[in-house]
Each structure stands twice: as structure tokens, then as C-alpha cells.
């Protein structure tokens, strides 16, 4: 089986990308776990890789120890990776800029980078979230703040820790620019990290943001001791809600059958490596939302996304019972068991909307 995986990840598509002679300069803005993992892949692939951090002391420790002790302790970084606090010098000389910061900081960082980007720079977002002020996805913020650049997103079932462990991983790059798709596949792909392409940037990005909500739902279910039947029901109903919501916003609901939809949903909803899953698990065990967020010590994007999506779903009149139920528990302080009973005894509905796609 392992040999089959090795052969799969070494198929001609990835071989072609990795054998190309072009050497790129890439800056990753954001020294968290995923930004570090991405920067490390790029460095390992032989490109110039810079990892920008705000905190000078952190950057110095990372550069000296060859390890991101705060977010990926115990995993050595490639010698080609340079940790820096020089944003201007880094982005002004980069072919590709990757923004990998929490959604609350995304616009600020985009504004910092904007005056220093070269024309036609490829700018990639890896942030999975939604800006509450206008319901903007991260790539839409890039369109608002940047000019004369080519924009894309990278999303999928990707835990940073497993990426740096060289676990076999698939991800999706999405952009309306074919050259962005090809370039990211070339620069980011490796023998253990396989990049697929999709022109539906909006759908890919929505999938990455929405699944965080449902990870909290399944985390709660796990804390309550629910069985496999329950988890299967929750996953499939979550996918249906995601597809319904995305279709109303103009995305291709079929995107949600791929890595950025179903793939990311399954990963995030079934693993305690997920921060959002752990928040849900803690709440299911009786802790308040505030206690749960404090306990994990890192940003759980699903908490903010839930508020935003609940409001938007009401505006669009989209049926999202899991979103409604989770919001009732976390923010309206309704009893969890009563909410569950309400979901199970609510109005009957169809399983799959064949005309709509999901």
C-alpha cells in the first residue's frame, strides 16, 4: 500500500512540475503552523523561501534554532528557509506572496504588503475565514486592497503538523488565472504534497471557511459519546448545508465534493488536531465557549465564521439547521440536549437536491 502511495505522488504531473528549472522567490506572510509548513515545502523544493513574522524575537529564535518552537515544536526547518521581520524587502522582491494569517488580521497585512508588491506578483491566500464587514472572503479582500496582481487561494484537508511530517497530503489551488494554477502546482508540489487545480476560487474558499463550523458540531457529538451512525449523519448533512449555502452565493456546489469541500470537512470533523473540533468537544463536556477558546490557546476560525454565516443565511433564507442549532448553543445559551431534540424532531426534508447539485 505504501508503495502505491509513493507511485501515486510521483506521477508525471508532479514530476513535470518539480523538474522544471525555474527558481522562484516566495514570501509567506504569517509565522503560524500552516504558514511555516508551506514555507518549509517551498524551501525544500529548492526555491528562495522567506517566512515573515511580526515578532523579531520569534523570528530570531526560528532562524537560529531552525524550528518554530511556538507553533511547530520538534520539527526541523529546511536550511533554505529564512525567517525575517523585513516585510518590505521580502515582498518587493518576491514572485509569489502567500498570506497565511488569521482572518481578523488579513486585511491589515494585505494593506501592509500592497504598496510594495511588484506588478503581476502572484498572491495566494491560505486563510480559511470570512470577513464580517460585508461578508468578504479573503481573496475578495485581496481584490479590494491590491492592484495589478494575480490572486489565488490554497485550501484543502491540510494539517500543518502532518505536512511537515511528510504525510501524504492533497490540496487545491484555485484561481481564474491558468498561469497561477500551474505556477503554484510547480512551486508547492512535492513527493508527499500533491496540488490539484480548480477554477472555482469562491467555492474552494467557501469550503475552507464553512467546514470550521461543522467541526465544532462533530466535536460536541464526540464529547457526548455519539456513535458512528451519528457522525455519518452529521457529516453528510453538513455537506448538504455547505452546498446549499454556497450555491445561493454563486459557487459551484460540485466543488464541495472535492478536497476543498468533502475532504476538508472529513478531516476537520474527525480529528482532535482541529482547533474547531476541540472547541466543540470542550463545550460538549460542559465548558463555556470562552473557556473552550482559552483552553486551546490558538485562533478557532469557526467561532467567528458561525456568527457571520448565521446572519447571511437568514438574509438569503437558506435552510441551515446545524448552523442554527450550534448558534443557539454557543451564543444563545440554549440547552444542548434540547437543541439536539429540536433538530431530530424538526420538519422532514429531502436528502439530496439533485437539480441543485447537492
Curated annotation (Swiss-Prot):
Its EC number is 1.1.1.94. GO terms for biological process: carbohydrate metabolic process; glycerol-3-phosphate biosynthetic process; glycerol-3-phosphate catabolic process; glycerophospholipid biosynthetic process. It is an enzyme of class 1 (oxidoreductase). InterPro entries: 6-PGluconate_DH-like_C_sf, 6PGD_dom2, G3P_DH_NAD-dep, G3P_DH_NAD-dep_C, G3P_DH_NAD-dep_N, NAD(P)-bd_dom_sf. Gene3D superfamilies: N-(1-d-carboxylethyl)-l-norvaline Dehydrogenase, domain 2, NAD(P)-binding Rossmann-like Domain. Sn-glycerol 3-phosphate binds at residues 128, 156, 211, 264, 274-276. Pathway: Membrane lipid metabolism; glycerophospholipid metabolism. Signal peptide: none annotated. The keyword NAD applies. This is Glycerol-3-phosphate dehydrogenase [NAD(P)+]. It comes from Saccharophagus degradans (strain 2-40 / ATCC 43961 / DSM 17024). The gene is gpsA.
